[in-house]
Regions:
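Active-site regions of enzymes building and remodeling cell-envelope glycoconjugates
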Residues: 47-65, 139-146, 189-191, 204-205, ...
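Donor nucleotide-activated moiety binding/catalytic core segment of transferases
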Residues: 251-299, 303-304
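A nucleotide-sugar donor-handling region in carbohydrate enzymes
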Residues: 125, 130-134, 138-216
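Nucleotide-activated donor-dependent transferases that construct or modify glycoconjugates
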Residues: 2-11, 207-211
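Conserved catalytic-core segment of nucleotide-activated headgroup transferases in glycan assembly
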Residues: 206-252
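Catalytic binding pocket for nucleotide-activated donors in carbohydrate/polymer assembly enzymes
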Residues: 297-345
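Structural motif
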Residues: 3-6, 90-94, 205, 240, ...
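Active-site and donor-binding regions of nucleotide-sugar-utilizing enzymes
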Residues: 6-160, 297-298
């Protein structure tokens, strides 16, 4: 059977999961399968020929936004790419979720132009979305309206929905997952286990990950976190301390968490502004201890490096809606990701 698999992505972390899917396909019987990717993120996975890659522009400023509105560069490139895809017996479209203009537009509209009578929609892992049924309760919430308006202006229509962001249209037939046992199945017919390649870590540094929702923690709470970090530092034999701010925080003066930990006595922090995926960055800096505010990056790090690293989280009940907190606790417990208070209180 002549088959194609089309991956859609918009973050470097998603491209890491796509790479793991590709590695899975290489180990299975996929001789007659062509791999394609449409992405606006860097670090395109290996194993996809240049002619099967479409690199879209990530809109990060007003100038790029105006180009998409008036010239519709991404939309034009996408339509041309879809038109160039030959006929296949089966085409599988792999997305992380549908809370994104590209994924929504491609599945709901571009897929109709693909030359195949058998179109399959699949999910690949993206943080916690494989393990919690995160939902949009109203299709008219403000963020959804912004996406609809942005899609309309750029020529890539976004379909409003309410329901689980991973499968709002009940169209997913296949799910790729690192932990099938606790994966939300939705209406899928098959859950396929993928995995990270085995990697050896060298180093004893500490890696602290920043978060985007700064308002979730007040100054008093951050002071308590500082005490716990200080206690951890007093009990661990470590080299250097690295801090990676969240990509959406451009000005470090707006990073309240970072400004807070700078006040820890005698602490010396090295900043990582690299856009390299956290999983790859960890190897280059040689970190074995990770601290973060329930960052889903810790899930991938634990899956990849297992007992070579220790992960500690804080702020679960403040950062995550109570409805989903139990799902986080389940995954964190499964992977031995511990609250910062344990065993440092």
């Amino acid at each position: 059977m002549n088959k194609a698999i089309i991956f859609l992505s918009f973050t470097t972390s998603q491209n890491q999961s796509i790479q793991n899917c590709i590695d899975y396909f290489k180990c299975s019987d996929s001789k007659n399968t062509d791999l394609l990717i449409i992405s606006n993120a860097g670090h395109i996975p290996n194993g996809i020929t240049d002619s099967n890659q479409l690199q879209l522009t990530k809109v990060t400023n007003w100038q790029q936004g105006f180009k998409q509105i008036f010239l519709r560069q991404n939309s034009r490139k996408l339509h041309s790419f879809v038109k160039s895809i030959p006929e296949y017996d089966e085409i599988e479209i792999c997305v992380p979720h549908f809370l994104n203009i590209l994924c929504s537009y491609f599945v709901n509209f571009c897929s109709q132009k693909l030359k195949s009578s058998n179109i399959i929609i699949s999910l690949y892992p993206d943080g916690m979305l494989s393990y919690q049924p995160f939902e949009i309760h109203s299709q008219f919430q403000m963020e959804s309206i912004y996406r609809w308006f942005g899609g309309w202006l750029s020529g890539m229509r976004y379909t409003l929905f309410s329901g689980p962001v991973a499968d709002p249209f009940s169209c997913v037939k296949k799910i790729y997952s690192y932990i099938p046992d606790i994966t939300i199945p939705y209406q899928s017919e098959k859950i396929i286990k993928i995995k990270f390649p085995k990697k050896k870590l060298h180093g004893n540094n500490i890696f602290i990950l920043g978060h985007v929702k700064q308002s979730k923690f007040d100054l008093d709470y951050l002071k308590q976190i500082n005490k716990k970090i200080l206690l951890l530092l007093s009990k661990e034999n470590y080299g250097s301390i690295y801090y990676k701010p969240h990509p959406r925080i451009a000005n470090m003066s707006h990073d309240a968490f970072y400004q807070s930990i700078l006040k820890i006595p005698d602490i010396n922090i090295k900043l990582c502004h690299d856009d390299t995926p956290v999983e790859s960055l960890l190897e280059s800096i040689g970190a074995s201890i990770i601290i973060a505010a329930v960052s889903t990056s810790m899930i991938n790090l634990k899956l990849k490096y297992k007992n070579q690293i220790s992960c500690y989280y804080f702020g679960l009940n403040d950062y995550v809606h109570p409805k989903y907190a139990t799902y986080y606790e389940s995954v964190f417990s499964y992977l031995s990701i511990k609250p910062l208070r344990d065993p440092y209180e």
